[in-house]
Design a protein with these regions (language model features):
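Pepsin/retropepsin-fold aspartyl endopeptidases
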Residues: 1-161
Length: 161
């Protein structure tokens, strides 16, 4: 089932992802910018700080350099972009899927945010109608939970390694 959200006037969609901040009993949400595809998504250092993550912990993640750093719709490169692993994540109701159910596990898990987090979806941005349509890729529904890394990967990606 495809989901549709409106693009803003600058040409990218803002989607909301729910996460549980470190040492917090409640869920919070973070915004992602989606441009012409999954490669243009990031969560900013500032937003992570607002959600209560320690600055040193954020900077312990992999800092994206050069071509690895995402760009926004204007073509400008995003500064201070870190690839970090968050304690828990749940995709919000804009998608309608629950990662715990998809992995057939009820335990909390970590999920790599950034470009990898959007690889499970097909993206279609219609700039004339100002909408972004996206849906979960059918073959990606079978996800593998890596207990050692505490992360999830699509089975197809794991089998290639």
């Amino acid at each position: 089932m495809a989901h549709k959200i409106n693009l803003n006037p600058l040409g990218f969609a803002i989607i909301r992802v729910y996460i549980r901040p470190k040492n917090s009993p409640t869920m919070a949400y973070a915004y992602f910018k989606v441009d012409t595809g999954a490669n243009c998504t990031t969560i900013s250092n500032k937003r992570l700080s607002e959600l209560g993550y320690d600055k040193n912990w954020i900077m312990s993640g992999k800092r994206l350099e050069g071509n690895e750093r995402p760009t926004v719709a204007s073509g400008l490169v995003v500064d201070d972009c870190y690839r970090v692993i968050l304690p828990e994540i749940q995709i919000g109701d804009w998608v309608g899927y629950n990662w715990s159910v998809l992995t057939s596990l009820s335990v909390p898990f970590k999920f790599l945010m950034g470009t990898d987090s959007m690889q499970f979806f097909n993206w279609n941005l219609d700039y004339e109608k100002n909408v972004c349509i996206f849906d979960l890729i059918p073959g990606k529904r079978k996800l593998l939970f890596d207990q050692k890394e505490q992360s999830i990967h699509s089975i197809e990606d794991t089998e290639q390694k």
